[in-house]
């Protein structure tokens, strides 16, 4: 997103460190030619952040963060880590994968700190949050070795219970990450888990998430989904189904009215697409309906969901 507020260009965040439990992802904003060179492996990822000067280096937009904490997986990049990073002035990121399972299991463990019940108490439709508590909360926790109560499986046309659970649990995680401060919080989802995406994204937006990050696929429809939810409208996502083209592929949708009745407008989070190929980044940048506000570029050192090698094999002295 440009400093003027439009999505006429996308900003590039170069991921210069492998993402692991004990490190973070350090980013630098760069122009398209330099980011493209990193993606193609013809230039190393820069090791500094926001270096000023030089005709080819742009000033960071006002909303940029020097450090974007990586989404490192379910139960690792949780609300406590994201909140701690945000309190230092950087962008804390919650891993949104499987939050319905993570939150409901914590409730079944008795929610000993009371954090999730406190978050659910702030859900805008109290009786929906109470339904989740009634179904999953176990006072004192389940016995050792006892099985957890399962959550509904993902399907193309989820039940009302399933959709509401996705919204409520994502709301709770983002609420806790943002509680008590005005720092920025992002949530990381996977394009591959498409059947969950509309409902979980809406739940995060309902809690005021500031950024949505997504990779592991081609997240071309996410900007349009965010636009729809920000207006209180139904959001729809075309499913990638082998053997189907755009005209015949099924879609999954979510209507905010199914949760809130008369759904109010919501602040639209910025969208950062995670890419590891110039081809994908160029495709997403072509039209406003697919263009993200920025890219997180996973180069050869990023250690993320890097795409398979493309193009002609090139070998150098080091391999």
Model-derived regions, located:
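Low-complexity, intrinsically disordered or signal/transmembrane-proximal segments
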Residues: 4, 24-27, 40, 47
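Residue-identity detector for glycine
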Residues: 5-6, 20, 41, 53-54
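Tryptophan (W) side chains
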Residues: 11-12
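Intrinsically disordered, low-complexity polyampholyte segments enriched for Lys and acidic residues
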Residues: 15-23, 34, 48
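Active-site entrance/lid segments in N-terminal catalytic domains of soluble metabolic enzymes
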Residues: 28-30, 35, 46-319
